[in-house]
């Protein structure tokens, strides 16, 4: 299972989905799916944009878990 920590990252910075969408240029729906951890596919460009926006490595956004 791959976990996405977007909701935690946004919460720590008090950001709304609309803020991230506006600032990154990503579609609101893409961010919502990642935020709710319901995305089944994600474009690598979206991951790249989010990592650049939050200034974090991929491992802080996404985490692989055996459970």
Task: Outline where the language-model segments fall.
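Short, charged recognition helix plus adjacent turn
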Residues: 8, 33, 52, 62-67
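Residue-level detection of the helix-turn-helix DNA-binding "recognition helix"
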Residues: 11, 25, 36, 66
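Key DNA-contact positions within bacterial/archaeal DNA-binding proteins
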Residues: 18, 29, 59
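The alpha-helix within a helix-turn-helix
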Residues: 10, 21, 51
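Recognition helix of helix-turn-helix/homeodomain-like DNA-binding domains
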Residues: 26-41
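DNA major-groove recognition helix of helix-turn-helix/homeodomain DNA-binding modules
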Residues: 45-60
């Amino acid at each position: 299972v791959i976990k996405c920590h977007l909701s935690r990252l946004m919460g720590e910075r008090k950001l709304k989905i609309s803020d991230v969408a506006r600032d990154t240029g990503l579609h609101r729906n893409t961010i919502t799916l990642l935020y709710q951890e319901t995305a089944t596919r994600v474009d690598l460009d979206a991951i790249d944009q989010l990592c650049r926006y939050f200034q974090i490595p991929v491992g802080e956004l996404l985490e692989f878990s055996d459970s």
